[in-house]
């Protein structure tokens, strides 16, 4: 490939609405161009990267035994009404009418279409299991498209659907797909974590998300240094605390005139924040509760809502707080002699001793508080907090916190769609059996942006080698000055290509600084400079994009380095 024959248009301009690094760099590198809100044109450069991601995904899906197909993106209303998602999916479902006023949607997922195909094609248990996948353009009518292709309305996705006679076989394929996804993201050269997740609008039972680790990620992840344990912060758990500490202090009321925050109380009293307990007033279907957390912890709404009777909890307002405690936020506490308060204590709080709480009196806190003596044992003890960096993990390791970008999701759907759409086969006894399903998605176009979020510097993109547009850029200095320089570059290009090294020759005749800046911006892993001075010395200048290391190497050493 020669850049003089390739459309490459880089720019230094950054649109004001480009918030993420990946969005800015993809625009600057000329990988994408905005057509309309949430709609992007992929340039030849961008498409090279997208196709490389697709190729790895396709190769591993085929290796795993899945079979590729292609489903229509425009799907009839009747199918989506069978699954009851025509209305339930909400405003993200783009609905259209043809000239006959028949209604369709531009599909964001393809459960209905693939189930319709399978119920027509499969009749016997002998045809199961089957795993069908496609790499196809999808559409979600996002209310606020942003972040470039990270959250575009139109996107490229690999979606796979497996069909099984029973749940045991579904679990087997689910594990097969989990292992396949691990191979895919490993081959893509990305740092990632697989985490337990919620199935969301698609539905189903067990599910797991795959996240690329990046500071700009929308999701907060917790993972252990001791094993492959990882979870979304909402679902992450820490090891159970040890036995309750021994009480040594007497109860005292202290003045905290303006200190409402736990941090301020700890600073005033010159004690660790971990000794302060925050009281969060909540209203439930059965009344008023105080949820108690350590001062350095935060409430996990999802964990709290899963406790019996708390599915519809909400934070109490100031009127309700005053009615039940006679106080105001910032000074609330569970010590209420003669006025029993229902308490939900986080597991960590339940084993504390000599702790500090609000006195239910404006301007005062209580110190030296202990269970059983100053207040009754909590009605409920449960894990209701978010884990934090450094917590002891259930496997004995330490909890680490990072942000992640979701790029893959696997589900055990069960029979949700098959039952709704009457997708059955005959079993060995001739009885009609409803098939059970799995669903496995990868955001192909999103991976491109996520890879950039994880791999970049001030100069531009640093592609993982497997998905770089080219592995090597051969840059020619003053190609018109001496035909020997051009001939040497052409020979090097031919040798690299014959060794199956994806190489581009920058023969545009630009100034070296401009040429080098372009190669750094578009993230080519290896740069080789062919110059008059180098040829005179029998060397080529080599620069590794990731390490920025520059060396002058002879051709034999250079080719060995590139092929390694």
Swiss-Prot record:
Keywords on record: Aminoacyl-tRNA synthetase, ATP-binding, Cytoplasm, Ligase, Nucleotide-binding, Protein biosynthesis
Catalytic activity, reaction form: tRNA(Pro) + L-proline + ATP = L-prolyl-tRNA(Pro) + AMP + diphosphate
Subunit structure: Homodimer.
Enzyme Commission code: 6.1.1.15
PANTHER family (UniProt xref): MITOCHONDRIAL RIBOSOME PROTEIN L39/PROLYL-TRNA LIGASE FAMILY MEMBER, PROLINE--TRNA LIGASE
Role, per record: Catalyzes the attachment of proline to tRNA(Pro) in a two-step reaction: proline is first activated by ATP to form Pro-AMP and then transferred to the acceptor end of tRNA(Pro). As ProRS can inadvertently accommodate and process non-cognate amino acids such as alanine and cysteine, to avoid such errors it has two additional distinct editing activities against alanine. One activity is designated as 'pretransfer' editing and involves the tRNA(Pro)-independent hydrolysis of activated Ala-AMP.
Superkingdom of source: Bacteria
Coiled coil: none
GO BP annotations listed: prolyl-tRNA aminoacylation
GO terms assigned for molecular function: aminoacyl-tRNA deacylase activity; ATP binding; proline-tRNA ligase activity
Family membership: Belongs to the class-II aminoacyl-tRNA synthetase family. ProS type 1 subfamily.
Domain description: Consists of three domains: the N-terminal catalytic domain, the editing domain and the C-terminal anticodon-binding domain.
HAMAP family: Pro_tRNA_synth_type1 (MF_01569)
Subcellular localization, as worded in the UniProt entry: Cytoplasm
GO cellular component terms given for this protein: cytosol
Protein name according to UniProt: Proline--tRNA ligase
ATP-binding is among the record's keywords: yes
Chief location of this protein within or outside the cell: cytoplasm
């Amino acid at each position: 490939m020669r850049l003089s024959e390739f459309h490459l248009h880089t720019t230094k301009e950054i649109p004001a609405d480009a918030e993420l690094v990946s969005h800015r760099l993809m625009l600057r590198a000329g990988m994408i161009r905005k057509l309309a809100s949430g709609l992007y044109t992929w340039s030849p450069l961008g498409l090279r990267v997208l196709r490389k991601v697709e190729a790895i995904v396709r190769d591993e899906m085929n290796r795993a035994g899945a079979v590729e197909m292609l489903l229509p993106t425009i799907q009839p209303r009747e199918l989506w009404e069978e699954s009851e998602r025509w209305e339930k999916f909400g405003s993200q479902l783009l609905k259209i009418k043809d000239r006959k006023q028949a209604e369709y949607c531009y599909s964001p997922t393809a459960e209905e279409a693939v189930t319709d195909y399978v119920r027509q094609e499969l009749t016997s248990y002998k045809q199961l299991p089957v795993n069908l996948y496609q790499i196809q353009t999808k559409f979600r009518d996002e209310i606020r498209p942003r972040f470039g292709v990270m959250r575009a309305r139109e996107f490229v996705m690999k979606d796979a659907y497996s069909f099984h006679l029973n749940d045991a076989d579904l679990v087997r394929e689910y594990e097969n797909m989990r292992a396949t996804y691990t191979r895919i993201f490993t081959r893509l050269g990305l740092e990632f974590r697989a985490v337990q997740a919620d199935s969301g609008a698609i539905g189903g039972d067990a599910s797991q998300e795959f996240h690329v680790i990046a500071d700009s990620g929308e999701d907060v992840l917790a993972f252990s240094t001791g094993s492959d344990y990882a979870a979304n912060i909402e679902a992450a758990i820490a090891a159970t605390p040890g036995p309750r500490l021994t009480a040594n202090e007497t109860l005292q009321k202290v003045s905290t005139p303006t200190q409402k925050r736990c941090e301020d109380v700890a600073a005033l009293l010159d004690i660790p924040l971990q000794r302060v307990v925050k009281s969060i007033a909540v209203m439930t279907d059965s009344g008023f509760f105080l949820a108690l957390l350590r001062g350095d912890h935060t409430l996990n709404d999802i964990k709290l809502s899963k406790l019996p009777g708390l599915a519809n909890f909400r934070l109490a307002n100031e009127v309700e707080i005053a009615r039940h405690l006679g106080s105001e936020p910032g000074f609330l506490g569970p010590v209420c002699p003669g006025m029993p308060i229902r308490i939900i204590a986080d597991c960590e709080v339940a084993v504390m001793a000599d702790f500090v709480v609000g006195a239910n009196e404006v301007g005062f806190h209580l110190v030296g508080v202990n269970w059983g003596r100053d207040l009754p044992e909590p009605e409920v003890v449960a894990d209701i907090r978010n884990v934090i960096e450094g917590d002891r993990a259930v496997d004995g390791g330490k909890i680490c916190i990072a942000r992640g970008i979701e790029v893959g999701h696997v589900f055990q759907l069960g029979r949700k769609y098959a039952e709704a759409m009457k997708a059955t086969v005959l079993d060995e006894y001739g009885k009609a059996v409803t098939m059970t399903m799995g669903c496995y998605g990868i955001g192909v176009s999103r991976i491109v942006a996520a890879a950039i979020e994880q791999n970049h510097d001030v100069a531009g993109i640093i592609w993982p080698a497997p998905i770089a547009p080219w592995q090597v850029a051969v840059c020619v200095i003053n190609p018109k000055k001496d035909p020997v320089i051009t001939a040497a570059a052409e020979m090097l290009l031919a040798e690299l290509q014959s060794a199956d090294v994806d190489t581009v020759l920058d023969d545009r005749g630009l100034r070296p600084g401009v040429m080098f800046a372009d190669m750094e911006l578009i993230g080519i892993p290896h740069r080789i400079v062919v110059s008059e001075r180098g040829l005179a010395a029998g060397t080529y200048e080599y620069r590794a994009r990731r390490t920025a290391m520059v060396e002058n190497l002879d051709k034999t050493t250079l080719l060995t380095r590139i092929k390694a």
